[in-house]
A protein has these predicted regions:
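Extracellular/luminal Protease-associated
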Residues: 92, 100, 153-266, 270, ...
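Noncatalytic luminal/extracellular "stalk/propeptide" segments of secretory-pathway proteins
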Residues: 72-203, 210
């Protein structure tokens, strides 16, 4: 599958869709109020090797989920982030250290560990950027360059990287200084083609939420009109919810293949693309667009190279070659710790692997082969999972029974205000019936949790791209649609949580962590051993 077909939360698209894509509230064909943070049930019921029979299936009892150990995994991952920006961006030294830590952890847990590496298109942020605006002093222009060090009385506003502005996916570089007096052209919501044409050779400034709705569409329009760079200001997404009355900028990706197509087969290396907060953007508007001020925009970014990303996997070979895989992405956006997206999911993968390691030590060889993987490259377009499925395609086509994806499987600590649901969806009707059955068991066994949290269940067994088809918003996508050249539809099950308004912002840290939601996540996973095997 080409990357322009990926509709992941990172590649596509609407700023206004970001929270909906992560909470999957638009996906549900059915929802059930049940006990506990559903990831528990989700993994229990979907990672199970499901088998539906005339007789009720005994799913067994639950194993103990170690919340303290899981929190330790979270802390370990966060400690590997960038020393200043805090993220574990794909292709960086931080992502490499993370993958090596994971690979070693799988080996320590008794799995056969393998560290896959792939060379993929990836942009890199090479140094601290600078974004400033300046109102010239009283003597600027009289033999003294406006906004130069000698311009007495100048007023310079320095915007804070990560808080006020964020570099966007596959941005190029820029080096505009005050002395160049680069013009910034107001593009409104992007619907007026004449404004785009007037911005040729200049910096375009677009207000998010308009008819040109995705980063890809914006960058394509900028290329078509030969803009020097592009600024997108957030005035419509999560305003007044996480930082005063401001609308915090978020990182979004762009489709690499669409940009190549628009630019004649090469990347626009000299076109920077950043997003700004509402408050910061309004300062820029006042000083530069509607005033006599100047802009400095220095973005040291490379977007035309391939970088190495990593996929560590731990495998325990069972009595059969039938394969169950559970995974989450270990990379984050470049400018945030990613405590929820997706450190929470990756740590849960580790805890499930640890529980199975303990179970195998006590009960012997499992019936099926178990594999745990984490993915690099997710935030920029599912690069790691796509490359892994491509490499392992024959084996996966023949043996994959089920892939389970854990991406932001977490409920915010303020669940009463922000939402208390966890979402489970799958693309197989039989698997869905087992999810329902295990959910009902969990509800009976955990009545207090049933009152506290809500679970949503969804079945998406339609064709690709259809409203009832499996969405491609995370790393499960290639496991569903890329087997045998798309001729075999793989089975997958996906878990999301709710309430992470800090998604893709610098504020995605442990201050919003709800450890209870992780503790309940996956302790029923072992039940796959209680269900007879069938061929997919």
């Amino acid at each position: 599958m080409s990357d322009d077909e990926v509709i992941s939360a990172e590649i596509a698209e609407e700023w206004s869709e970001a929270s909906n894509r992560r909470s999957a509230l638009d996906f549900f064909q059915s929802s059930t109020a049940i006990a506990g943070i559903l990831v528990v049930l989700f993994v229990s019921s979907t990672f199970l090797y499901f088998y539906l029979d005339e007789e009720p299936v005994d799913y067994g009892t639950s194993l103990q989920f170690d919340a303290e150990r899981t929190r330790g995994y979270i802390d370990d991952l966060l400690a590997l982030g960038h020393p200043t920006w805090e993220g574990r961006m794909s292709g960086t030294a931080e992502e490499q250290a993370t993958a090596e830590y994971i690979n070693n952890l799988f080996e320590e847990l008794g799995y056969q560990s393998t560290l896959h590496t792939y060379e993929v298109p990836m942009h890199s942020v090479n140094s601290e950027p600078s974004l400033r605006v300046c109102v010239p002093g009283a003597i600027g222009g009289i033999g003294i360059a406006p906004c130069s060090p000698a311009d007495a009385g100048q007023q310079v506003t320095t915007f804070n990287h990560r808080m006020d502005y964020v570099i966007q996916g596959f941005s190029g570089e820029s080096s505009f200084t005050f002395d160049q007096n680069m013009e910034v052209v107001y593009l409104g919501d992007g619907s007026d083609d004449s404004l785009w044409a007037a911005a040729e050779g200049k910096i375009g400034y677009i207000v998010g939420g308009g008819s040109v709705s995705s980063n890809t569409d914006i960058m394509v329009k900028a290329i078509e009109n030969d803009l020097a760079s592009i600024i997108r200001v957030n005035k419509n997404y999560n305003c007044g919810t996480i930082e005063g009355n401001d609308c915090v900028p978020i990182f979004k990706g762009t489709s690499h293949s669409a940009i190549l197509d628009a630019n004649g087969g090469t990347m626009p290396t000299g076109m920077a693309f950043i997003a700004m907060s509402k408050d910061a953007g309004e300062i820029l508007e006042s000083v530069v667009i509607n005033g006599t001020g100047r802009i400095e925009m220095i973005m040291d970014v490379t977007n035309d190279e391939e970088l190495t990303i990593r996929v560590p996997c731990g495998t325990y070979y069972g009595k059969s070659s039938e394969l169950l895989i559970v995974g989450g992405h270990h990379d984050t956006v470049y400018h945030a710790p990613g405590a929820v997206d997706d450190t929470s999911g990756t740590a849960t993968v580790f805890e499930i692997a640890a529980m199975f390691s303990e179970y195998i030590a006590e009960n012997g060889e499992p019936d099926r082969t178990l594999r745990f993987c984490t993915w690099g490259g997710e935030e920029e377009g599912l690069w790691g999972s796509i490359a892994y499925v491509d490499e392992m395609n024959q084996d996966l086509t023949e043996n994959l029974r089920l892939y389970i994806n854990l991406d932001m499987n977490h409920v915010d600590i303020d669940y009463e205000t922000r939402g208390n649901s966890v979402t489970l969806f799958t693309n197989d009707a039989d698997d869905y019936k087992h999810i329902e059955a295990i959910a009902e068991e969990y509800k009976k066994d955990n009545p207090l949790m049933a009152e506290k949290y809500r679970i949503n269940l969804g079945l998406y067994d339609g064709p690709k791209g259809a409203a009832n088809g499996m969405p491609c918003n995370s790393d499960h996508c290639p496991f569903v649609y890329n087997l045998d050249g798309g001729n075999t539809i793989g089975r997958a099950a996906v878990c999301y949580g709710s309430g992470s308004l800090e998604y893709h912002t610098y504020l995605d840290d442990t201050s919003r962590l709800n450890e209870e939601s992780l503790r309940n996540f996956c302790y029923d996973i072992w039940k796959l051993h209680e269900v007879p095997s069938i061929q997919p």
